[in-house]
Amino acid sequence: MLGAGCAAALLVAFGGASAESIEGSVQGNKSEQASSDSSKQDYYWKVWNGALPEQRDKGDHADVLAVLTGKFTGPPIGCKFGFRGGGLAPSTIAARSGTTVRIENRDAFTHELSVSGLPGFTPLESGPGKARAIPVPAGGPWELGDRIYGHVDGHLHSMRELVACATVTASGKFRFDNVPPGPYSLRILRGPEQVATRRVTVPAGKTLKVDPLNMSKSRRR
């Protein structure tokens, strides 16, 4: 939830316009099985023995992120990411080009975030409650990992006109809040790819409900 200061900044940025919500969902192109039964058995054995943290159930959409892009001068809305349940939540993250994104450690154990191919980023351990700030230049996407726990993976997208982020539930639903009225591009990111896009216009005074988006193979951003 935005604080009073951030909300005021949004209103100033859009000339006193109200802030609205967008509701939608994704469908199709479910995640493929990530590992064999034998590797799963090995993973759960290590969890039981305390060698690995227990990873949350990813379902079909833990690697999916909904974002809005467009003309917007305020800070990105709802773009909060972190480690939770032994992995990145969500595993696909986005940040505005030329800024930094914070990855909070919400687990009770230490993580060591790595970003493959990102110049100037040094993996360092982050204890419970700590956060790492990642500088995000133009380019990417970049692969994310954890030098302590090899099962952790993810991707970081750099987006020049990022406005807002929304996580996608296991049932495929997402919701943006506190979005100023106006035209935007609604984009669905999954791993290193953009798998759906649609132009939307947020009206003043009511929630915009978007028809389901079909996730497809990679599309250029």
Q: Whereabouts are the PLM-identified features?
A:
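Bacterial N-terminal signal peptides
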Residues: 3-13
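Extracytoplasmic copper-binding redox domains, predominantly the cupredoxin/blue-copper superfamily
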Residues: 17-221
